[in-house]
């Protein structure tokens, strides 16, 4: 059952990522039709902006993420021996280099991982997590975060965030080009083209315009669907490492029972946390939820 869940989640992720890339190209094609009456120009624009933006995002240092979330590095075992030993042992079981270790001085129990590859991985936990969890529960949470690093989830989520940003940039650019085109006579040219092409040309133009306007909303929903799926995968992978689903279940129950929101959370970092730092209590995931409900995660773990 465990390995079936892992395989199913990996397949689902592949489909989501492929769909995401196709969606970006579709947005580019729609912009090409709207602005230049040529979808190929839009495809080239989308591919170029996407490639550059993804490269910039992927090359960004994990230290930037840590700084945004006020995380302080643990540089020696003596500073946090239990945390250090847990991260070291889980990394060894996972077969990856030991990630850098950080602590966020926040009373709300939570954790996150960053780093685009296992060689550049880093794990951060809040002070509240260290104070609230027993060691076997901490192992479950750390195994979850180590799984994110081993499964290249941070790289995937970085690409997804970049693609959402690219779509937002393209959509905004299209609106500006349409506006300036209308001021400089582009509208008259478009009307002439529509007269030559008939009603079909008008319909294509309107559909493309609506698609471009809605694209950022759809892209954000896809990004969060990917995030929720990777949380399920990391839970299953954590059990693969610890062979003890109860530790992760108990940790989730304790975190769910804690009502304190994190005091300082970077909005752009919300999706990377172990559980939603905003303490959502939903029983069913919404389209724009970065995490599945904790009750749903526990149910899946109990069925392994």
Curated annotation (Swiss-Prot):
GO terms for cellular component: plasma membrane. Its main location: membrane. Belongs to the peptidase M48B family. The active site is at residue 145. Keywords: Cell membrane, Hydrolase, Membrane, Metal-binding, Metalloprotease, Protease, Transmembrane, Transmembrane helix, Zinc. It comes from the Bacteria. Its cofactor is Zn(2+). GO terms for molecular function: metalloendopeptidase activity; zinc ion binding. The chain crosses the membrane at residues 14-34, 39-59, 159-179, 202-222. Its EC number is 3.4.24.-. Zn(2+) binds at residues 144, 148, 231. It is found in: Cell membrane. This is Protease HtpX homolog. Residues 275-304 are annotated as: Disordered. It holds the Pfam family Peptidase_M48. It is an enzyme of class 3 (hydrolase). Binds 1 zinc ion per subunit. GO terms for biological process: proteolysis. Disulfide bonds: none annotated. It is a multi-pass membrane protein.
